[in-house]
Amino acid sequence: MKKYIFNRDEFTWAEEFYEIIKKKMGLPDYFGCNADALWDMMTGYIDTPCEIVLVGFGEENVYNRNFLQRIISCFEDVEKEYPEQFKVTKIV
């Protein structure tokens, strides 16, 4: 199973997280850097099964928290929809 590890210490602003996701998951240049595009990539582009590991995602300022929660929710929703293909692990 392919494992993608995302550490909160890798970026300052939430918007940067999409670029990290794009790089680590090998997403194409046309990836739209939004939750809908992430869902599309997760369910039709990347090889599965895979595990998404989120390390250190906890207390955030309000802006980062709301923005990051959309991304994390996307990962969790994909896991719920396709439990045989995706696993999300959070390490605080």
PLM feature segments, named:
Residues M1-Y30, Y45-V92:
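N-terminal intrinsically disordered, low-complexity segments enriched in P/E/S/T
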Residues C33-N34:
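Short glycine-rich substrate-engagement loop in P-loop NTPases that contacts/grips substrate
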Residues M41-T43:
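Short, intrinsically disordered low-complexity segments
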